Regions:
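N-terminal segments that cap or nucleate solenoid repeat domains
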Residues: 1-2, 8
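Register-specific detector for alpha-helical tandem repeat solenoids, activating on a conserved position
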Residues: 22-26, 48-52, 74-78, 103-104, ...
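Structural signature of tandem-repeat unit edges
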Residues: 7-22, 33-48, 59-74, 84-100, ...
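Predominantly recognizes leucine-rich repeat
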Residues: 3, 29-31, 55-57, 82, ...
Length: 145
């Protein structure tokens, strides 16, 4: 939808209706200058694909996905790939029971220090290569068992 909007800096999506969306892949792909994004109002209950959703958002520092419902998502590959300025990411409400692909999910998040993935379930995942590749500053990881 906003894929390759390279000069997009700000966007208000508070009234955006996503209740029928099943594919959010590449939604903000390569939005190089986007710094803050509040998606707390997004209805993601029907979404199956979130691959590369924020990939290449090099300037993204703050991202609110606190109300995402990920119970039907199957693909999260490269979701945050290249979000190199993000220091903290709270995915506390992400449930990943149906996810099969998480490869390169956080690849290149070189400034990521805190990550909350407390409800991640890797039972059905068959691709997880490079998931934390390049996350050299990651010091706080909250995960399940």
């Amino acid at each position: 939808m906003f894929s390759e909007c390279a000069f997009l800096k700000k966007i208000d999506l508070s009234k955006f209706d996503t209740s029928q969306v099943v594919d959010m892949s590449r939604m903000f792909y390569e939005c190089y200058e986007l710094e803050n994004l509040d998606l707390s109002n997004f209805d993601t209950s029907k979404v199956i694909d979130m691959s590369k959703m924020f990939a290449g958002c090099f300037a993204l520092k703050k991202l609110d996905v606190s109300n995402f419902n990920t119970k039907n998502v199957e693909d999260m590959s490269s979701m945050f790939d290249g979000c190199c300025l993000m220091e903290e990411l709270n995915l506390e409400n992400f449930y990943t029971d149906k996810v099969t692909n998480m490869s390169y999910m956080f690849n290149g998040c070189q400034n990521l220090k805190k990550l909350n993935i407390i409800h991640f379930n890797s039972t059905n995942i068959n691709k997880m290569d490079g998931i934390f590749e390049g996350c050299s500053k990651l010091t706080e990881l909250k995960s399940s068992k």
